[in-house]
Amino acid sequence: VLNELKDKPGVSVDERMADLAVAVGRTLHPEGTALFVEPGTRLGGTLTAKLRETALEEGLTPVAPCPHLGPCPLLETRERRWCHASQLAVAPAWLADLARYAKLPKDSLSLSFMQLRPESEAAPIAKTALFPAMDPNGVVARILSEAFPVPGMGHARYACTEDGFAIIPAAGDIPSGALVACRRPASPRKDAKTGAVELLWQPEQKPQR
């Protein structure tokens, strides 16, 4: 994992990720793919986002989890948020016992990841292939958060899109980390806390992984 790369005195995280992106670009097979998986912590999300940024400069394309090839909105925002997804998981018995003793729940697994391919082999997410009945002017969003209550929006979730950081109302039923088809409302609201712009997901289009 990226957080276990050996530190070098005087070398920043950005420089470490740039060196790694160069190495991946030089060694990756033209039809290959490289997958980096981190714990779903703030550090893990920052490392994968920094790797993505430098990988693009080296001619690599992030094919997952990113639904676009633009700048990462989470690197641009001042909010302490990061790209990660959670899913239910069953811990080994010894870990479950320890978690109960420490009063730390271990019923889910949170990960940050980045999948890279050579630019010539990668293709942007095809909206019509994933969501045949999607609004032609719509946008694909990657869910980034658990559901949380927002006045006037029900249980909302944050998401990453080609338009930037977004908030999706009434999203309690969407799985964490899923890709969803959304449409842009005529008069989108903004999240007062983060400035995320409102998108409306199309529930008739099944969320994808």
For each of these PLM feature ranges, what is it?
Residues 12-36:
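A short glycine-rich, Lys/Arg-flanked "PGG" loop and its adjoining helix->strand segment in the class I
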Residues 47-71, 76-89:
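Conserved Class I S-adenosyl-L-methionine
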Residues 14-17, 45-49:
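Conserved strand-to-helix beginnings and helix N-cap segments that scaffold or border functional pockets
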